[in-house]
């Protein structure tokens, strides 16, 4: 309850596209969708399919779209493919829907490098998954996201999915990160533990 109230208080005055949100509304509300990254039969990114998806999202009443999350298979795309995908989504949904960009790495140095080098024009926030495979301590998780926040030009959504990463962001670490920076604006909580949301 208190974390949700804190997040709402930090985002209430954040101004984004006025055609979607009125002043004093939270940055992202309603129903969002994590988009797939469509490919054609030859293994190339299907740009026309991205356009059709975006139109479907918009007409269907979706509130915001996550690009290059787990569903978008960002971990299997190379840098060039990611740039192509980013630009296509931005062009297709410009002045229509807010976009969240997934940027993640289990290396803090690499994550910061990716954030600093990625063209985030057209995106409203970055979503970054908890460091995976290495099973960091809670202090390690805090330092990972702290460094990302310090270099990021955009607000950051934490992404907790221990079933895939084998690491779990504790409630205390979430609160600590939220207290550290107003750029931490929320979390995608995919642990499946509903009591954590209630707490």
Language model feature labels by segment:
Residues 7, 34, 182-183:
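Generic secretory/membrane-interface signal
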Residues 164-199:
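Catalytic alpha/beta core domains of metabolic enzymes, predominantly
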